[in-house]
Amino acid sequence: KHQTPNTKYQIPNTKYIYQDNQGLSEARNTGIKNSNGKYIAFIDSDDFINCQVLLDFLGKDDSDMPDVVFLNAVKYDKGRVSYFGEDYQPEKILNQSKVEVLKGLCRFRKFPGSAWNKIIKRELIIREKLFFEKGIYSEDIEWSMRLFNAATTFSYLDGCYYYYRQGRKDSITGTVSEKGIKSLLYILEKNAKMEFNRDISSYLYSFLSYEYLVLLFIMTSKNIACDSDIKRRAYHLRFMLLKSNKLIYKLIFPIITLFGVDITGRILKAIRGNI
């Protein structure tokens, strides 16, 4: 708060905006509304980036300006760098159709739904009103589903771009809370009502299915007592597993139907890392 106003005078083409703390979503939305560049990147306050990767991309011909550009990220902890373990495969993104790109992303065990590991064409964000929903946790998931449904062209930049600082406690699986569970449940219910394009529907439902299993997993946390309404709503969302393109998700559907969300959540916790 105290150093940023001084920093702005040292960095050219920088716009400094101050607003009272209204949460991450509103901070991003304010940035979007006040932006005027070709692309928008989202950087969390405790992380940092390799600016040269962006400069190399922006120096390219304007005729090749995709809607979304995927970027590599690494974990950073006290000067040490480690990899996430799942890197983008350029051949599954570059010069590929939207269907093939989403198909390639489905190979990830986790849904690549973070806002910070990609840059997005500003024109697309404004046209499709891709603002972040305020008042919820896991807003990146909700936003990414709308982004993937709206975008048509994709690309990939090689090189280490984003340094994700370790030791953070803001992940939904790292800090479980009642609001976190209700937020994820709300996001899943909202997307369950969306009409996705038929040719990409199964891939988007695979992303949702992963988050659905995360929901069942965190609902079994010892410090959280989920009421019957939350369990009922979670149970009714199991149909998403059948709409995904992954066999393992489809096989979990009858387990939930037979044993319910409580026992299934405990099973998922026992085999964590293998789904």
Where are these regions (language model features)?
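TPR repeat positional signature
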Residues: R28, S209-Y212
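Glycine-rich, basic loop-to-helix element that forms the pyrophosphate-binding segment
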Residues: Q19-S35
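Catalytic core of nucleotide-sugar-dependent glycosyltransferases
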Residues: G159-R168, G174-D199, V214-L241
